[in-house]
């Protein structure tokens, strides 16, 4: 993805040396911040993976959140490696693994967007048709959907790496254009569906004829979707636009494009803290409890008065 690599090799005339120097300084500062922040998000996601994978009984939504944590970890890992190589000025080494880092980054982003959309849809279904959802929903739906989304999310970046790679001399203009159109269309579909079901869910909870009790799971999902709509979708939109306008990329990168990438990186780190915040607050106050109990409460699908929880 040219989105974060043009500053590595771009040069400019002397008359623009000052603006370019400022741009490079900003770029390096953002990478230093990424090296500092990304490991925090990676550790938080590892904690989520450990407890949801081995310590807590899974349900439909915990399976999705588990896979979402994997995608967030992959994104942060790829991004932190890129930032480390830039800060250490290992540009030669980065030249050879750039395509792999870009593939992992977009793979993780597309999967994260896809799984968040599915979570929003299922949350909407569970509220609008609770009896059908809890009684008739196939048992292994979550596992099947996750496998399909992993495969589909890997397909587009893998095809781009195969057909659009200059490094491996496999660039095919016609195929590359088709792949970009299809992947861009898929992202647009995800954007529209996510926004639509999020709006339906909000209206159903706040304006429905019957009062629907809000659960911690609803709050957790709502916060994640809100942050994705604010910080995640701009990253995807810019990626789509960038695929069709790379001639003046240096100017755009120096302006705001890499800011979008790093803001989304920070957003992923914040996402991991949502579970701990939602799970640890009770009656407007933070409660002292184990991490396992905090995560259990964060994905609790029943209201507190009906869930039988015995927090301190």
Curated annotation (Swiss-Prot):
It comes from the Eukaryota. The chain crosses the membrane at residues 32-52, 68-88, 107-127, 141-161, 181-201, 221-241, 260-280. The keyword Transmembrane applies. CDD domains: 7tmA_MrgprB (cd15107). GO terms for molecular function: G protein-coupled receptor activity. Keywords: G-protein coupled receptor, Membrane, Receptor, Transducer, Transmembrane, Transmembrane helix. It is found in: Membrane. The keyword Transmembrane applies. It is a multi-pass membrane protein. Residues 53-67, 128-140, 202-220, 281-312 are cytoplasmic. Residues 1-31, 89-106, 162-180, 242-259 are extracellular. GO terms for cellular component: membrane. Orphan receptor. Probably involved in the function of nociceptive neurons. May regulate nociceptor function and/or development, including the sensation or modulation of pain. Belongs to the G-protein coupled receptor 1 family. Mas subfamily. This is Mas-related G-protein coupled receptor member B3. It comes from Mus musculus (Mouse). The gene is Mrgprb3.
């Amino acid at each position: 993805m040219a989105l974060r690599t043009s500053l590595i090799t771009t040069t400019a005339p002397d008359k623009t040396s000052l603006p370019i120097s400022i741009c490079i300084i900003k770029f390096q500062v953002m990478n230093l911040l990424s090296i500092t922040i990304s490991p925090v998000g990676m550790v938080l996601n590892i904690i989520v993976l450990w407890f949801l994978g081995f310590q807590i009984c899974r349900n439909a939504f915990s399976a999705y959140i588990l896979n979402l944590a994997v995608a967030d970890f992959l994104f942060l890992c790829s991004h932190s490696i890129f930032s480390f190589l830039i800060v250490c000025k290992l540009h030669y080494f980065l030249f050879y693994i750039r395509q792999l880092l870009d593939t992992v980054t977009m793979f993780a982003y597309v999967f994260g967007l896809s799984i968040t959309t599915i979570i929003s849809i299922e949350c909407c279904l569970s509220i609008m048709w609770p009896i059908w959802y809890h009684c008739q929903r196939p048992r292994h739906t979550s596992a099947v959907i996750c496998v399909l989304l992993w495969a589909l999310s890997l397909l587009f970046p893998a095809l781009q790496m195969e057909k659009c790679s200059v490094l491996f001399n496999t660039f095919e203009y016609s195929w590359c254009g088709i792949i970009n159109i299809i992947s861009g269309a898929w992202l647009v579909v995800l954007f529209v569906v996510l926004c639509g079901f999020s709006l339906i869910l909000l209206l159903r909870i706040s304006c429905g004829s019957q009062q629907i009790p809000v659960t911690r799971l609803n709050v957790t999902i709502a916060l994640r979707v809100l942050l994705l709509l604010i910080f995640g979708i701009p990253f995807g939109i810019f990626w789509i636009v960038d695929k069709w306008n790379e001639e003046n990329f240096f100017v755009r990168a120096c302006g705001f494009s890499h800011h979008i990438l790093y803001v989304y990186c920070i957003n992923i780190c914040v996402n991991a803290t949502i579970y701990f915040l939602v799970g640890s607050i009770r009656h407007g106050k933070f409660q002292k409890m184990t991490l396992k109990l905090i995560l259990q409460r964060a994905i609790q699908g029943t209201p507190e008065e009906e869930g039988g929880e015995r927090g301190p």
